[in-house]
Amino acid sequence: MRKPIIAGNWKMNMNPTQTTEFVNAIKANLPKFDQTESVIGAPAVDLPALLEAAKGTDLKVAAENCYFEEAGAFTGETSPKTLNEMGVDYVIIGHSERRDYFHETDEDINKKAHAIFKNNMTPIFCCGESLETREAGKAEEWVSNQVTEGLKGLSADQVSSMVIAYEPIWAIGTGKTASADQAQEICAVVRQTVAKLYDQTVADKVRIQYGGSVKPANVKEIMGKEDIDGGLVGGASMEPASFLDLVHFND
């Protein structure tokens, strides 16, 4: 049985004071860790405040990005080694905004996955197609290829433990949501791709999230689908009441 995982992705929002206030507002009401995993992904400048406020709670912490080298002359980048030393649990990689605005390639993202595992953290690996790709009937092929490239060289144990987030680009921040059936269809393709690359045991263990305008009103239906184990949530994760509604989708 795969444990549900609801992760907020704050993108470039919130400051350290707001971060502390947010965690203080939710920490007494989080679901038990053995029921649902609650995660917040925050900008690098907020991570110390988030880690401090989350101490002793069931809240896990994600960085929104890191570099694939541990140290060196890489101005402006974040070291995976340092993130691990700080106590970060997850790192989001391959988000469409990183691929699109910052021209990250499949190879870059694969190197990051290796660096994250090397430093004892877990990647939340994002994949997803554009509206153009979907309308051309190539969504399944596109996403399967992203997963294939992103997992290159990773062991079966590593893939079993990671999180893959399917985020159709046309549904991120647009108010458009893939229907629960559309989301399930591609999440099933992700799982089938993992089964082909590794085996069914690995595919049955990997947790797959759907991301793209997930909110309290639709989370229960989305989470009811066979191959969807969680949500990667933007806007709806930035209000304490809304985030609590999301992590308590099962109540």
From Swiss-Prot:
Protein name according to UniProt: Triosephosphate isomerase
Catalysis performed (reactions): D-glyceraldehyde 3-phosphate = dihydroxyacetone phosphate
Assembly information from the UniProt record: Homodimer.
PROSITE patterns, per the entry: TIM_1, TIM_2
Organism: Latilactobacillus sakei subsp. sakei (strain 23K)
Stretches that traverse the bilayer: none
Keyword Secreted appears in the UniProt entry: no
Organism taxonomic ancestry: Bacteria, Bacillati, Bacillota, Bacilli, Lactobacillales
Documented EC number(s): 5.3.1.1
Pathway membership: Carbohydrate biosynthesis; gluconeogenesis; Carbohydrate degradation; glycolysis; D-glyceraldehyde 3-phosphate from glycerone phosphate: step 1/1
A Pfam family that the UniProt record links to this protein: TIM
One biological process term in Gene Ontology: gluconeogenesis
